[in-house]
Amino acid sequence: RAMSFYQSLAAWEYVTEHATDFAWGGGTQDYVLALKEGEAGAGIVTPPPDMSTGWVAYVEVDDVDATAALAETLAGQVLRPPFDVPGVGRNALLRDPNGATIGVAMSRHNFPVTRRQFGNEVYLSADRSFPRDFYARLFDWEFSKPQVDENHSRNKIAVQGQIVAATWDDSPLDNLASRWLPTIKVIDPLGSLRSVPDLGGVKLGQMSDAHVPQDLLFLEDADGELVCLTGA
């Protein structure tokens, strides 16, 4: 259902790849790359039984194995040790001290960095905390000074001066565990949000902030997974 949902919502196209030793569970299995305008910023796989479903944000690193080892010294966890994905690269799955899942990758493909398919990642925290030291030491990220608006705090995250993500210490959703969410770019965010119920999803709410140029629109897709929209 997710493939049809995002094809209609965000004009994604798909390419199916075949693995003889599938990295997410072994054996022979197909996996899907999601493309838009030549960018392949997402993949769709069926996770093994011991893993939950949902979006996983990935950070590009020079050495996946070293990064995974470092995470464990910074109060993080390795959920899935480093593994190779044929035609894609080497990955690992980590959990930060707040419990949010984050992937690390060293890519070995020719697709360009996604700029039209996705916006900046967003970190949502239900308890108004963000493991800043963990991410600063793990990825050498830079953080802006907190931007406070109506008692809510935001931080921008940069790599070599380029904004790549943001933290929000509140959300329009109740009882939400800390997590990274992608922001999918669409031409008409409000129009796309109105179409969500017809596509089998659920509209949840939005966040506005004087420091953020566009609202973030939150929804559940046709499989019940959280995601947000922003303008292209």
Predicted regions and their residues:
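Vicinal oxygen chelate
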Residues: Y31-A34, T46-L70, E72-D127, K145-I163, W168-P172, L193-A232, ...
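Surface-exposed beta-strand edges and flanking loops
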Residues: T16, T46, T167-D169
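N-terminal beta-strand motif that seeds the catalytic metal site of vicinal oxygen chelate
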Residues: R1-M3, G54-A57, A105-D133, L138-S144, ...
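Active-site-adjacent scaffolding segments
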Residues: A19-P112
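Short low-complexity stretches enriched in small and charged residues
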Residues: D50, V78, R137-D140, K185
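Core segments of cupin and vicinal oxygen chelate
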Residues: R1-E39, T73, F83-G89, Y123-Q162, ...
